[in-house]
Amino acid sequence: MGVFNRLRSFYEARIAPTVASFLSRISPDPNIYTLASPVAAAAALPAWLYISPVASLLLIALSLLLDAVDGAVARFTGRVSPLGSFLDSSLDRISDSLYHATLYIAGVHPLIVIAMLSGGLIVPYLRAKGESLGLEVRGRGLMERGERSIAILAILAISIYNLQTALALASAAAVLVWITVIQRMVYIAGELRR
């Protein structure tokens, strides 16, 4: 189990119930948090251009936080639903696309952004496909959504001060995302051959 998966387990067991208890008093509807996540991600684009890169980073961090709490609120309030699951997965892809658009606005080369985004869209597809075939795919590969999100935040933060370093990190992230695609494809194909 990777470091991020251990952190996720700790979050889900220790932090999420407390956060969910608090947030459920603000709104017990977890879909509110799900819907707010891409709104914050979309606001990050003009924020980078017209307010400040730091404001944009804060909006992306807020978007990621909202995405992390929607499921916790759903479980805490007993409002887990197929609709919520569908909205979460679908809107995550929209948010991911908006994070990558912010990378482009920050000056990351378009081909690097395309490589990161396309691989980043294939990774969750492979998980969904594998799980529809009865396989447990979560935790397989180097760059799951959490790792990709942290990488994007780091690349954006570094791009404010040193674009060349940010480009190098974005290139490395793109390679790691595609390694994750290959890891998942190999795992799923291997399991299906059994």
From Swiss-Prot:
<feature type="binding site">
    <location>
        <position position="70"/>
    </location>
    <ligand>
        <name>Mg(2+) 1</name>
    </ligand>
</feature>
<feature type="transmembrane region" description="Helical">
    <location>
        <begin position="150"/>
        <end position="170"/>
    </location>
</feature>
<feature type="binding site">
    <location>
        <position position="67"/>
    </location>
    <ligand>
        <name>Mg(2+) 2</name>
    </ligand>
</feature>
<dbReference type="GO" id="GO:0008654">
    <property type="term" value="P:phospholipid biosynthetic process"/>
</dbReference>
<dbReference type="Pfam" id="PF01066">
    <property type="entry name" value="CDP-OH_P_transf"/>
</dbReference>
<feature type="transmembrane region" description="Helical">
    <location>
        <begin position="103"/>
        <end position="123"/>
    </location>
</feature>
<dbReference type="InterPro" id="IPR054868">
    <property type="entry name" value="archin_ph_syn"/>
</dbReference>
<keyword id="KW-1208">Phospholipid metabolism</keyword>
<keyword id="KW-0479">Metal-binding</keyword>
<feature type="binding site">
    <location>
        <position position="92"/>
    </location>
    <ligand>
        <name>Mg(2+) 2</name>
    </ligand>
</feature>
<feature type="binding site">
    <location>
        <position position="88"/>
    </location>
    <ligand>
        <name>Mg(2+) 2</name>
    </ligand>
</feature>
<dbReference type="InterPro" id="IPR048254">
    <property type="entry name" value="CDP_ALCOHOL_P_TRANSF_CS"/>
</dbReference>
<keyword id="KW-1003">Cell membrane</keyword>
<feature type="active site" description="Proton acceptor">
    <location>
        <position position="92"/>
    </location>
</feature>
<feature type="binding site">
    <location>
        <position position="67"/>
    </location>
    <ligand>
        <name>Mg(2+) 1</name>
    </ligand>
</feature>
<keyword id="KW-0464">Manganese</keyword>
<comment type="pathway">
    <text>Lipid metabolism; phospholipid metabolism.</text>
</comment>
<feature type="transmembrane region" description="Helical">
    <location>
        <begin position="58"/>
        <end position="78"/>
    </location>
</feature>
<keyword id="KW-1133">Transmembrane helix</keyword>
<keyword id="KW-0444">Lipid biosynthesis</keyword>
<keyword id="KW-0443">Lipid metabolism</keyword>
<dbReference type="GO" id="GO:0016780">
    <property type="term" value="F:phosphotransferase activity, for other substituted phosphate groups"/>
</dbReference>
<feature type="transmembrane region" description="Helical">
    <location>
        <begin position="172"/>
        <end position="192"/>
    </location>
</feature>
<feature type="transmembrane region" description="Helical">
    <location>
        <begin position="32"/>
        <end position="51"/>
    </location>
</feature>
<comment type="similarity">
    <text>Belongs to the CDP-alcohol phosphatidyltransferase class-I family.</text>
</comment>
<keyword id="KW-0812">Transmembrane</keyword>
<keyword id="KW-0808">Transferase</keyword>
<dbReference type="GO" id="GO:0005886">
    <property type="term" value="C:plasma membrane"/>
</dbReference>
<comment type="function">
    <text>Catalyzes the formation of archaetidylinositol phosphate (AIP) from CDP-archaeol (CDP-ArOH or CDP-2,3-bis-(O-phytanyl)-sn-glycerol) and 1L-myo-inositol 1-phosphate (IP or 1D-myo-inositol 3-phosphate). AIP is a precursor of archaetidyl-myo-inositol (AI), an ether-type inositol phospholipid ubiquitously distributed in archaea membranes and essential for glycolipid biosynthesis in archaea.</text>
</comment>
<keyword id="KW-0460">Magnesium</keyword>
<feature type="binding site">
    <location>
        <position position="88"/>
    </location>
    <ligand>
        <name>Mg(2+) 1</name>
    </ligand>
</feature>
<protein>
    <recommendedName>
        <fullName>Archaetidylinositol phosphate synthase</fullName>
        <ecNumber>2.7.8.39</ecNumber>
    </recommendedName>
</protein>
<dbReference type="InterPro" id="IPR043130">
    <property type="entry name" value="CDP-OH_PTrfase_TM_dom"/>
</dbReference>
<keyword id="KW-0472">Membrane</keyword>
<dbReference type="GO" id="GO:0000287">
    <property type="term" value="F:magnesium ion binding"/>
</dbReference>
<dbReference type="InterPro" id="IPR044270">
    <property type="entry name" value="AIP_synthase"/>
</dbReference>
<dbReference type="InterPro" id="IPR000462">
    <property type="entry name" value="CDP-OH_P_trans"/>
</dbReference>
